[in-house]
Amino acid sequence: MANHKSAEKRARQTIKRTERNRFYRTRLKNMTRAVKEAVEAKDVDAAKAALKVVNQNFHSFVSKGFLKKETASRHVSRLAKLVNSLVA
């Protein structure tokens, strides 16, 4: 347990940040899984729709500071490549 006022505040902030990061990480994993499942099911429309949602959310997480721009672009690019392989 923290003994100083500033240490107590840092502990509170760490808890909040951890919960927020867990929420973002879970959302990203679920959205990515939705795209991959649609590709495995060979459902082009669902894959494209899921990819659009992934793209929007990844870049919104960039603006919130959860991801770096290059990281989000890399993930979206790889998922787009999967979806395009299904279309082609």
From Swiss-Prot:
Residue ranges of the region described as Disordered: 1-20
Family: Belongs to the bacterial ribosomal protein bS20 family.
InterPro entries named in the record: Ribosomal_bS20 (IPR002583), Ribosomal_bS20_sf (IPR036510)
Keyword Ribonucleoprotein appears in the UniProt entry: yes
Molecular-function annotations in GO: small ribosomal subunit rRNA binding; structural constituent of ribosome
Species name: Campylobacter hominis (strain ATCC BAA-381 / DSM 21671 / CCUG 45161 / LMG 19568 / NCTC 13146 / CH001A)
Pfam family, one: Ribosomal_S20p
Lineage: Bacteria, Pseudomonadati, Campylobacterota, Epsilonproteobacteria, Campylobacterales
Function statement: Binds directly to 16S ribosomal RNA.
Domain of life of the native organism: Bacteria
Any one annotated GO CC term: small ribosomal subunit
PANTHER family registered for this protein in UniProt: 30S RIBOSOMAL PROTEIN S20, SMALL RIBOSOMAL SUBUNIT PROTEIN BS20C
Designated name of the protein: Small ribosomal subunit protein bS20
GO-annotated biological processes: translation
